């Protein structure tokens, strides 16, 4: 397949709006459903990175305690040494104050960052300042250096641990939690803003909006349509999951300035990554295609079962259930990757399809379905929020932008670097096969 010339690729990019600019215009008409926002009890829960910090603070106390106990366990016995260290305390020769200093850090940091869950650095600034000043004075004035290896070891270890805690909080905990809070507030703002142009997503596709259905109405929201139909509790859960995935995909598209470049290829395809709160690292493929958006919509979104005919990264795709006009359950089997080091995986996803004025969107997330229980033949992967987005060009209807958002857990004991390499390679391979398919359809026409 011949690749796009560089000038044509640049022209395509100039003629197509950026994802973020689109997200700030018409996509704002799609208000985020309230289930995008974590429930209050989840918002109050301590974050994973803060929990790790608290564990490290606990390790600080336990490690200093262990070293002190080893120092006490000499020929004269622990009990006698404890009397000398505590009852007959001497600043110049005792290690007891270093243990008390570790307990001071432990109690202060856990009170501030585990119990009160403070978002400021002042508590650790106090504990680190007190620890550093005390240890420096003790090393200068005491006679610990005459007590052998422990005279060097305990002050140094205590000093290093105190500053490691400072680094961890300042460079890991607070920035990551601030980023999660920014995402949460952005989602809240989108919910409060409400629909500006038209409510709900329209489904006008041939496969999912029959003439007699309610999905073709411009004046009816998804909730009103659902109210006119009878859904089971499980079907309502599928619909909720699909809407949640769509809301997260909209947020990712609106955060294009925060996408981190990973790699590109000679065809102009680019892979980015972004850390999504509560879902982790997400891969994003962005490519420009010399064809109408409707063509990609038909081939990739409306006809997933036929994708196996041209997409070599997928070996099977089956629609298990059509819940309603916008929502369906699919079963997919991926081909192996990384030269066979990553074996085929199977996935059960709920998909939500929306047709908007500026784009076509198919978003999905992992779910469970009785028609496809776990099997020994494949390792069952689990997809986070993601999907396909086909962006229309406002100035040139013969070109479009294709975005694939992929958040997946392949399960199994696979090295992280191997997973990341295989996902990026799979995305490039998919883009290659998609271009081939477009060329074949163009030749037939």
Swiss-Prot record:
A motif (FFAT) lies at residues 206-212, 207-212. It comes from the Eukaryota. Residues 46-217 form the MENTAL domain. The chain crosses the membrane at residues 52-72, 95-115, 121-141, 149-169. PROSITE patterns: MENTAL, START. It is a multi-pass membrane protein. GO terms for cellular component: endoplasmic reticulum membrane; endoplasmic reticulum-endosome membrane contact site; late endosome membrane; mitochondrion; nucleoplasm. Phosphorylation at Ser-209 is necessary and sufficient for the direct interaction of the phosphorylated FFAT motif with the MSP domain of MOSPD2, VAPA and VAPB and allows the tethering of two membranes that participates in the formation of ER-endosome contacts. Phosphorylation of the FFAT motif leads to conformation changes. Additional phosphorylations around the core FFAT motif (QFYSPPE) are not essential but strengthen the interaction with MOSPD2, VAPA and VAPB. Residues 73-94, 142-148 are extracellular. Present in retina. Localizes to all neurons of macular retina and especially cone inner segments and axons (at protein level). One of its GO terms (biological process) is vesicle tethering to endoplasmic reticulum. PANTHER family: STAR-RELATED LIPID TRANSFER PROTEIN 3, STEROIDOGENIC ACUTE REGULATORY PROTEIN-LIKE. Sterol-binding protein that mediates cholesterol transport from the endoplasmic reticulum to endosomes. The sterol transport mechanism is triggered by phosphorylation of FFAT motif that leads to membrane tethering between the endoplasmic reticulum and late endosomes via interaction with VAPA and VAPB. Acts as a lipid transfer protein that redirects sterol to the endosome at the expense of the cell membrane and favors membrane formation inside endosomes. May also mediate cholesterol transport between other membranes, such as mitochondria membrane or cell membrane. This is StAR-related lipid transfer protein 3. It comes from Macaca mulatta. The gene is STARD3.
């Amino acid at each position: 397949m011949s690749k796009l010339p560089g000038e044509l690729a640049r022209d395509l990019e100039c003629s197509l709006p950026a994802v973020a600019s689109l997200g700030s215009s018409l996509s704002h008409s799609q208000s985020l459903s309230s289930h995008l926002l974590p429930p209050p009890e989840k918002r109050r829960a301590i974050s994973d990175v803060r929990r790790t910090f608290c564990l490290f603070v606990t390790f600080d106390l336990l490690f200093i305690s262990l070293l002190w106990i080893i120092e006490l366990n000499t020929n004269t016995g622990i009990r006698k040494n404890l009397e000398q260290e505590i009852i007959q305390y001497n600043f110049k020769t005792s290690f007891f104050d270093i243990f008390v200093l570790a307990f001071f850090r432990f109690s202060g940091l856990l009170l501030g960052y585990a119990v009160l869950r403070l978002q400021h650095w002042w508590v650790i600034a106090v504990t680190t300042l007190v620890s550093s000043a005390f240890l420096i004075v003790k090393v200068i004035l005491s006679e610990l250096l005459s007590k052998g290896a422990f005279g060097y070891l305990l002050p140094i270890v205590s000093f290093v641990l105190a500053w490691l805690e400072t680094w961890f909080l300042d460079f890991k905990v607070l920035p990551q939690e601030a980023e999660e809070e920014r995402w949460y507030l952005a989602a809240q703002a989108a919910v409060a803003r409400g629909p500006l142009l038209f409510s709900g997503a329209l489904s006008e596709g041939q496969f999912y909006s029959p003439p007699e259905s309610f999905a073709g109405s411009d004046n009816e929201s998804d909730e009103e349509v659902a109210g006119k139909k009878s859904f089971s509790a499980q079907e309502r859960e599928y619909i909720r999951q699909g809407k949640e995935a769509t809301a997260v995909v909209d947020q990712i598209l609106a955060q294009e300035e925060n996408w981190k470049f990973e790699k590109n290829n000679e065809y102009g395809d680019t892979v980015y990554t972004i850390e999504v709160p509560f879902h982790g690292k997400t891969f994003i493929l962005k490519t420009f295609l010399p064809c109408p958006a409707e063509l990609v919509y038909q081939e990739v979104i409306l006809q997933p079962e036929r994708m196996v005919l041209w997409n070599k990264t997928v070996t099977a795709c089956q629609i298990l259930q059509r819940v309603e006009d916008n929502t369906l359950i699919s079963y997919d089997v991926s081909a192996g990757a990384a030269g066979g080091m990553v074996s085929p995986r199977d996935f059960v996803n709920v998909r939500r399809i929306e047709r908007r004025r500026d784009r076509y969107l198919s978003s999905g997330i992992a779910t469970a379905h009785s028609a496809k229980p776990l099997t020994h033949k494949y390792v069952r992967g689990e997809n986070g929020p993601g999907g396909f987005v086909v962006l229309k060009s406002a100035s040139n209807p013969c070109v479009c932008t294709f975005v694939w958002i992929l958040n997946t857990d392949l399960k199994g004991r696979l090295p992280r670097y191997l997973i990341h390499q295989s996902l990026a390679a799979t995305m490039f391979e998919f883009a290659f096969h998609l271009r081939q398919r477009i060329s074949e359809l163009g030749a037939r026409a």
